[in-house]
Design a protein with these regions (language model features):
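Bacterial N-terminal signal peptides that target proteins for export
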Residues: 2-13
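A short, solvent-exposed beta-strand micro-motif common in secreted/extracellular proteins
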Residues: 85-94
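Short Pro-Gly-centered beta-turn/loop motif in secreted/extracellular proteins
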Residues: 71-86
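Bacterial N-terminal signal peptides
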Residues: 12-22
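Sec/Tat signal peptide C-region and signal peptidase I cleavage site
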Residues: 23-28
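Extracellular beta-sheet/turn segments enriched in Thr/Pro/Gly and aliphatic residues
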Residues: 110-147
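A short, amphipathic beta-strand motif
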Residues: 31-39
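Acidic, glycine-anchored loop motifs typical of Ca2+
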Residues: 94-103
Length: 147
């Protein structure tokens, strides 16, 4: 009788674990990014997604990087199954096609770029809180590139 109770308890815990594993979906299967304001249709567009303020502030280690080279998909880029709820997006068009965001010697951007939620930049730096959004609350994000 004791082994039946022990086995039954293990089965119950395993079942509860599986239920919690499959019920809590922490990804977006419906988020679409529309990019506007790009310079020419022959240069790829890159989307970098950040989930941590530290990595965004240090310009390193994005959670994901999506590159879109197909001219027909420039306006609609699907972001599916990324594992975090709160993200901030940085988008740029790679005019010189070297795969990196190019800046001049002063650190000013040489390529069109934009952020999720399109914050007004003025003369201050963009912080993570200005671009972060909940992936479950949006179905479509439109990002305007600054030239």
């Amino acid at each position: 009788m004791h082994s039946f109770e022990a086995n039954f308890t293990k089965i119950i815990f395993f079942t509860i674990f599986l239920v919690f594993l499959f019920i809590n979906h922490s990804f977006s299967d419906h988020l679409t990014v529309k990019v506007t304001g790009f310079k020419d249709a022959s240069s790829p567009i890159y989307i970098w997604g950040y989930d941590r303020k530290f990595y965004f502030d240090n310009d390193s280690a994005p959670l994901f990087m999506v590159g879109e080279r197909d001219i027909n998909n420039f306006n609609q880029i699907n972001l599916k199954a990324f594992p975090h709820l709160i993200v901030g997006l940085f988008v740029f068009q790679d005019i010189d096609q070297n795969g990196i965001f190019s800046k001049n010697f002063k650190g000013d951007p040489l390529e069109p770029y934009g952020f999720s939620l399109n914050p007004v930049q003025g003369y201050q730096e963009i912080v993570f809180e200005d671009i972060a959004f909940d992936m479950n609350k949006f179905e479509k994000i439109e990002i305007n590139l600054n030239n």
